[in-house]
């Protein structure tokens, strides 16, 4: 009886917090998306599916959706590939001190606030005249690049920054997954004369199935929701809306144009996209075995 009371004592605050700050806002967002809602008005009218119908005719939304899918697709693919390669490289060292050093070094950017890191990159690395990136290009004979002002380069600049700031978290997860694989699998493979590539391909990669699923889903969700770097680095959606993504468009519609009903409809669209991709990802990477 005491154990049940303790469990309730621990779980009830968690569920209350989850409902107030997760489930509640989602339900409220669905409700607001069906209204012509402006917080500055005394009364707001029910609009039905009007906001959702406008989604299909909004060319700016189409551009934001394209930018979002491009950003997420490239960053997630590069993030997972590079973090797995780096984690595998770190696991090759026998010394725990060396492995811990590399893990700490790669994880440090994750500790800094994302807004602060975005400001540092925007003001110290990417500026056309005085930025570190262009200074390095000049030393090897290349012309300076307008990293945050060229519509063809802006998104790639943010992709590079996002990978730098976010890759350390997945390196830690993959390193933990690799360390948990029993060494007898590798010992048996060495006795059979397997190369390092074959051990990675036929042992490490398959046995990281659950870790890979978790990392992929969490990275997808977090990158779909990223907002800080676009808010800091991109000036007014960027040239030709090249830096506009769904999260920044939601913010613009809700807090600049004050059309929260339409902003909520875009948020519902983003929620549906994330939900569908997560379900598909779970089906594709489903793992039914254990070791």
Give names to the regions the model predicted:
Residues 3-291:
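A structural signal for multi-pass alpha-helical bundles of membrane permease subunits
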């Amino acid at each position: 009886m005491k154990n049940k009371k303790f469990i309730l004592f621990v779980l009830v605050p968690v569920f209350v917090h989850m409902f107030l700050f997760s489930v509640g806002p989602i339900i409220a967002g669905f409700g607001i998306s069906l209204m012509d809602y402006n917080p500055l008005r005394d009364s707001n009218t029910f609009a039905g599916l009007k906001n959702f119908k406008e989604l299909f005719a909004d060319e700016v939304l189409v551009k934001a959706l394209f930018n979002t899918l491009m950003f997420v697709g490239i960053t997630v693919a590069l993030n997972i590939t590079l973090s797995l390669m780096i984690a595998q490289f770190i696991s090759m060292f026998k010394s725990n001190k060396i492995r811990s050093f590399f893990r700490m070094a790669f994880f440090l950017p994750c500790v800094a606030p994302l807004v602060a890191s975005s400001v540092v990159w925007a003001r110290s690395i990417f500026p056309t005249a005085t930025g570190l990136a262009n200074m390095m290009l000049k030393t090897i004979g290349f012309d300076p690049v307008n990293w945050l002002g060229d519509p063809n380069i802006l998104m790639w600049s943010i992709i590079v920054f996002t990978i730098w700031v976010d890759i350390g978290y997945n390196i830690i997860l993959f390193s933990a997954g690799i360390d948990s694989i029993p060494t007898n699998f590798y010992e048996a493979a060495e006795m059979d004369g397997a190369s390092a590539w074959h051990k990675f391909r036929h042992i490490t990669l398959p046995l990281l199935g659950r870790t890979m699923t978790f990392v992929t889903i969490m990275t997808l969700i977090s990158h779909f929701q990223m907002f800080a770097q676009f808010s800091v680095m991109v000036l007014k959606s960027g040239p030709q809306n090249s830096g506009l993504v769904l999260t920044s468009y939601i913010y613009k519609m809700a807090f600049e144009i004050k059309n929260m009903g339409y902003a909520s409809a875009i948020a519902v669209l983003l929620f549906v996209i994330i939900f569908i991709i997560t379900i598909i990802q779970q089906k594709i990477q489903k793992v039914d075995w254990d070791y």
